[in-house]
Amino acid sequence: MRHYEATEYILSFLLGDATPLDISGKIRISRHAQMQHSPDYVAYCRPEEAKPYHRVVIVPSGFFDYEQYGRAESMPTLPLAEWHGMPLLFGEPREESLETPYGTRLIIYADLVASSYFLLSRYEEMYYRKRRDEHGRFPGRESLAYRAGFLERPLVDEYAAELRRLMGEIGLAVQPMEPGFSSVALTHDLDQPYYSSGVRGFLRLLLKERLSLRAAYRNTFSRASEDLFFSYGRFLDWNVETQRKCASPVRTIFFIKTPSPHPLDKPNYTLRNHKIAAIMRLARRRKVEFGLHLNLYCSEHPDAVEAAKVELEKELGESVTCSRHHYLAVREPEDYNALLGAGIYHDYSMGYADVAGFRLGTSRPVRFINPQSLEVTDLILHPLTVMDYTLHDEKYMHLDYAEAERVALAMVEQAYKYHGEVTLLFHNENLLLDDPHIYHTRLYRALLRQIIKLSPAPDIVGL
């Protein structure tokens, strides 16, 4: 059965961590090197096919059947049934118990495997190929999770917690989902690393933005630290403080673009630019990690990913194994194969730009499952918890501060509840002191304080 590898991985993800031993982005952990088999006493089969020693049987709904997979019949219909208070995509919301010589057997007719697979693999994005926005992205508001009202819930993690609880009730020892953060990634995309640089930047400020000659000159040719968008020193101090005060592993990642012919990838820059060089010196002193910010040209032409990676590695003088797409513009699920082909093993693009929520149905890092081939790959997808532009931009959620804080804190707390990973994305141009119409400096600080409060290091009081 071609779905065997995928269903085995889903079971292991539901019943254990099933995440790489190293999630730093520095080491490739092969799916073959890391054993990820479900326990022998758990089976995904029809009740009559169960072995005598099977204590838990999850009954397939037919989703993976050849006649159904990839067809209209495989898509969930609204309204969804509920299983133990959770939306159920496939199967029947019931279970039954059966006494056997090996102990109580739990038969679950809710197809938790297919329901989890649908979310983790972005199956609907493969099926609805024509549902794309102007950047080729599948809109979050088109997703089943948004339309069914559970996008802000990590539903796969909820399934996992409830399944483990039920297994404990029949005397099986399972790994509990203890609250906490598996790790915290404080990420910053260098989309607009500076306000102005070079002669073209100077002329833009002078002629288009109508700045005075003195102001245009100061913003363009002065020291990098005097640039309007140079907020790096301040927020890196906050990140370092969070790393010191948080019990969970905390790291900072800068995602850096390479030059592109796409008009929306401007400004194009290289690390030789004097302002970029100053940013990089500061970042290296603060132990920042670097990833590839895949430009829109790479989104439209996945075969360009490898060249972009080689170019960035040459400029950095070090290898790069993690990435994020500019505009979060991952177009088709199978486009992720280009990352693997280029030697990228960790991606941080998995959030919707237009609405906050758990795009993959989980707060935990998970392997990319190709819904076309059903292959479980070596690429690790890190769910995006919060992005600044999603919250305030008029094209997206357009929230005021109070509502943005509520949404963002709730996402962080959900990740904590299920021992997930928090990944924050805040841009340097939104972390300014003197820009009162955008609230992200205040919000970013509030999120860092909450992370420390939930997972404080020993004998440390919050910020």
Protein language model regions, located:
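Conserved acidic functional residues
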Residues: 189-191, 293, 345-349
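Long, K/E/R/D-enriched contiguous segments that form extended
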Residues: 216-218, 223-226, 235-337, 341
